[in-house]
């Protein structure tokens, strides 16, 4: 999916919501545990209920890898289900990969060739040669970690060099030498507030993947005020606040209702 297609889908749905599939078998409704594949059964129901209100899904690989082979199978089935039934949805593999060139090339092959996923999150710490293998696939996206929503982001990302440039700003500037706004996005946590204003001075045209709305307390209004650009430029993720909004047999219906609430907020902002 290219940038124009993504923007057109945002306009059509009046939404830039991404539903995070951080599926924990300890948190899904008990009645699903009787299913042959409880994780996939949960994901399928969530996807069917939320698809009208979102433009992307973001399975977090850690939740699937922690279950070994069964978890990876559930992940593959989830990706296939989205692609077959909701082909307009942008799929993000939240894997946070990043290693030396040969290893990164294998990661890229996994997500872009074997699974044909639209995008993957990548850690930039090891530099250009750890990122470029992901950039060799036409129509695929790298989503580079820039300024995250966790408290530990202060440990490194907000530290300044002798010129007063913060590390996340250096990541933004340097990585523009490797790619452009047609194949690279950045992760910026919703809890970072006014930092979006500084980020847009460096990357005015790139899409930003924004986790931290909902359970982590980020403000959608603040993110949009400082982060939105002429093509929207935002994919705002919500995971727990949607997928775990209810633990009864009505969990999917409630998840759909929560996604619809967020979509309505987004539509209001887009129409201002």
From Swiss-Prot:
SMART domains linked to this entry: OMPdecase
Catalytic machinery residues: 96
Keyword list, A-Z: Decarboxylase, Lyase, Pyrimidine biosynthesis
Source species, domain of life: Bacteria
Chemical reaction(s) catalysed: orotidine 5'-phosphate + H(+) = UMP + CO2
A GO term, aspect molecular function: orotidine-5'-phosphate decarboxylase activity
Enzyme class label: lyase
Residue pairs linked by disulfide bridges in the UniProt entry: none
EC numbers: 4.1.1.23
Gene3D superfamilies: Aldolase class I
GO biological processes: 'de novo' pyrimidine nucleobase biosynthetic process; 'de novo' UMP biosynthetic process
InterPro entries: Aldolase_TIM, OMPdecase_type-2, OMPdeCOase_dom, RibuloseP-bd_barrel
Pathway: Pyrimidine metabolism; UMP biosynthesis via de novo pathway; UMP from orotate: step 2/2
Similarity-based family: Belongs to the OMP decarboxylase family. Type 2 subfamily.
UniProt protein name: Orotidine 5'-phosphate decarboxylase
Organism: Phocaeicola vulgatus (strain ATCC 8482 / DSM 1447 / JCM 5826 / CCUG 4940 / NBRC 14291 / NCTC 11154) (Bacteroides vulgatus)
